[in-house]
Amino acid sequence: MTNIRKTHPILKIVNDSFIDLPAPSSLTSWWNFGSLLGICLGIQIMTGLFLAMHYTSDSATAFNSVTHICRDVNYGWILRYAHANGASMFFICLYLHVGRGLYYGSYTYSETWNVGVLLLFAVMATAFMGYVLPWGQMSFWGATVITNLLSAIPYIGTDLVQWIWGGFSVDKATLTRFFAFHFVLPFIISAMVMVHLLFLHETGSNNPTGIPSDLDMIPFHPYYSIKDILGFLLMLTALSVLTLFSPDLLGDPDNYMPANPLNTPPHIKPEWYFLFAYAILRSIPNKLGGVLALVLSILVLAIIPLLHTSKQRSLMFRPISRFLFWLLVANLLTLTWIGGQPVEYPYIAIGQAASILYFSIILILMPLAGILENYMLKW
């Protein structure tokens, strides 16, 4: 008799996605991050759901409701900090997942890649709106500064900002709508993840060599399911240590002060995972130019499949491109550091140099390196 998992309409989908899925035999731990992101999303939805049961999205009570969760709700403190630090783990996994895709040329599966870029935008939007909800000083001023960037759009900018705010400043209406969107977006993200996996399973996974692996496939379970469980344990350990020992390590102390529209914090900055984009935004003196650079810093990922000039897929056997890739990583770390510094010399100059280098590597140097490597191999 055929196993029920191979015949049942629903179990068959699960079977073909997670059990009998043919996977390349050479996948390294860099392929763990997709499943880790799934776990992160699950943790965020679960903790977020329980937080939403006690949170009130009203500007008069939001800050106090978060304090109430931490002090009075059973294990509310662990829910709150697991949710806040879970977002950090989510972004660490996201950036490593994208980095893996860039290094091994996974972006040549353009449908999967472009759904992934949309997912990145959706997760960033969700995280931004979530940061506003505790209604502390940095929440309020972060929301004010970032939404105000839309006023740089010619002609409709000011009207658009006031439409998003629901008034003439960030206030009660803004908080309520941000909570509504923050609640619903993770479910939209879950649907997009299914589309992401659908496109991935049309082509099968890439592998470290970048060479088609149709001749050498192994079943996902037990080989990669066991490998993924090790990743889960390591990530959950890291999240637990962060949540239980230093829950405020990655947060901003200003957010423990209730939002005050009359008092601006000395340094307005977003959470650490947005600092690289914030540094690019600040490095351009013109408002519209800065906003365009901010959007393009992420949107540039969408055109990477068009910029692939090499005859090889992976960077594994391309030393010049590999050097540029690690230069890009170092550059992003530099931008992250600059984003957290005050706007003064020499940080402005370093930020501008790093921003120019960021776009130069992706748009100019990497494609040229691909052409050069083809020439060196006489291809």
UniProtKB/Swiss-Prot annotation:
Gene3D superfamilies the record matches: Cytochrome Bc1 Complex, Chain C
Localization, UniProt: Mitochondrion inner membrane
Residues that span the membrane, as ranges: 33-53, 77-98, 113-133, 178-198, 226-246, 288-308, 320-340, 347-367
Record has Metal-binding as a keyword: yes
InterPro entries the record matches: Cyt_b/b6_C, Cyt_b/b6_C_sf, Cyt_b/b6_N, Cytb/b6-like_sf, Cytochrome_b, Cytochrome_b_C_euk/bac, Cytochrome_b_N_euk/bac, Di-haem_cyt_TM
Binding-site list for heme b b562: H83, H182
An annotated GO BP: mitochondrial electron transport, ubiquinol to cytochrome c
Required cofactor names: heme b
Record Pfam families: Cytochrom_B_C, Cytochrome_B
GO molecular function: metal ion binding; ubiquinol-cytochrome-c reductase activity
Signal peptide (residue range): none
Gene Ontology CC annotation, any one: respiratory chain complex III
Positions bound to a ubiquinone: H201
Main location: mitochondrion
Cofactor annotation comment: Binds 2 heme b groups non-covalently.
Keyword field contains rRNA-binding: no
Keywords for the protein's UniProt record, in alphabetical order: Electron transport, Heme, Iron, Membrane, Metal-binding, Mitochondrion, Mitochondrion inner membrane, Respiratory chain, Transmembrane, Transmembrane helix, Transport, Ubiquinone
Residue positions binding heme b b566: H97, H196
Note: Heme 1 (or BL or b562) is low-potential and absorbs at about 562 nm, and heme 2 (or BH or b566) is high-potential and absorbs at about 566 nm.
Subunit structure as annotated in this protein's UniProt entry: The cytochrome bc1 complex contains 11 subunits: 3 respiratory subunits (MT-CYB, CYC1 and UQCRFS1), 2 core proteins (UQCRC1 and UQCRC2) and 6 low-molecular weight proteins (UQCRH/QCR6, UQCRB/QCR7, UQCRQ/QCR8, UQCR10/QCR9, UQCR11/QCR10 and a cleavage product of UQCRFS1). This cytochrome bc1 complex then forms a dimer.
Function: Component of the ubiquinol-cytochrome c reductase complex (complex III or cytochrome b-c1 complex) that is part of the mitochondrial respiratory chain. The b-c1 complex mediates electron transfer from ubiquinol to cytochrome c. Contributes to the generation of a proton gradient across the mitochondrial membrane that is then used for ATP synthesis.
Family recorded in the similarity comment: Belongs to the cytochrome b family.
Name by which UniProt lists this protein: Cytochrome b
